[in-house]
Amino acid sequence: MTTLDLTARSDRGRVYWLLADCWNIVRRGLTHYQRQPVNIAWQLGFPILSVLLYGYVFGSAMKVPGGGDYKDFLMPGMFVMTMAFGFINTATLVVYDSTKGVIDRFRSMPMASSAVVAGRGVTDLITACAELAIMMLTAFAMGWRPDGGLGFLGAFGLLLWLRFALIWIGVWLGLLVPNPEAAGGLFAVAFPLTMISSIMVAPQLMPDWLGWVAMWNPISSTAAATRELFGTPVGGDTWVEQHALLMAGVWPVILTLVFLPLAVRRFKKLSR
């Protein structure tokens, strides 16, 4: 009979084992994708379908304030929408692990609770990079031509920054909902929240009250900031529109400060 040597973990620093535990969770998540290629194919295929569908269906039917090509306006919004919808996949994977007993096994191991949560987040961030790369290549093939250089890299970083913040909402919700079917129902909540934003239509073209809500939607700030960095700024008259770059950095910080502790606390509560 073998026993688990817990003293070995005390020989090294807490940070080391936190990172080691986090990496084990990341490796487990990536291996899961490798063994179930259908899941990753769908996760990477949906962004392509979104770009093609919205790009060709709405590409010549919508107007942009101040003129300009709607495709240049739409593509950054589509990138933001995919990052926003990603939290549903996070929640679904977390609740799937919970119902299959995987979370119980993690709780029985001598590993940090925060490492389990963080490992899920890092895994999803890696897949988000792949999603963005595929979407941008598809958009480029459709004729989208952003400005290159630091602006392009900055926009890519802001998109991942938003995804990073929304991951913790997905983890928290995944630990709350009872089954994967209920997690799938989160789409009914996410869809209107993403539509009431500037990802497809400028808030100036909405009714006044709805436009005000859309302007203060965190998704709108990231959409406006990425458009500016990609070289197709839209602008606006309100403070939040004129400071889109600032708010695109601030909103994810607020969301992370709120939902990351909630996710870790919920995981610890399950351990009691």
Curated annotation (Swiss-Prot):
Induction: Expression is repressed by the HTH-type transcriptional repressor DrrR1 in the absence of daunorubicin. Residues 38-270 form the ABC transmembrane type-2 domain. One of its GO terms (biological process) is response to antibiotic. It is found in: Cell membrane. Disruption phenotype: Deletion of the drrA2-drrB2 operon decreases by 33% the daunorubicin (DNR) titer in cell culture. The drrA2-drrB2 mutant is more sensitive to DNR. Deletion of the drrA1-drrB1, drrA2-drrB2 and drrA3-drrB3 operons almost blocks DNR production in cell culture, suggesting that disruption of these operons impairs the efflux of DNR, resulting in intracellular accumulation. Keywords: Antibiotic resistance, Cell membrane, Membrane, Transmembrane, Transmembrane helix. One of its GO terms (cellular component) is ATP-binding cassette (ABC) transporter complex. GO terms for molecular function: ABC-type transporter activity. The chain crosses the membrane at residues 38-58, 73-93, 124-144, 156-176, 182-202, 244-264. Pfam families: ABC2_membrane. PROSITE patterns: ABC_TM2. It is a multi-pass membrane protein. The complex is probably composed of two ATP-binding proteins (DrrA2) and two transmembrane proteins (DrrB2). Belongs to the ABC-2 integral membrane protein family. Part of the ABC transporter complex DrrA2B2 involved in daunorubicin efflux. Responsible for the translocation of the substrate across the membrane. Confers self-resistance to daunorubicin, an antibiotic produced by S.coeruleorubidus. This is Daunorubicin resistance ABC transporter permease protein DrrB2. It comes from Streptomyces coeruleorubidus.
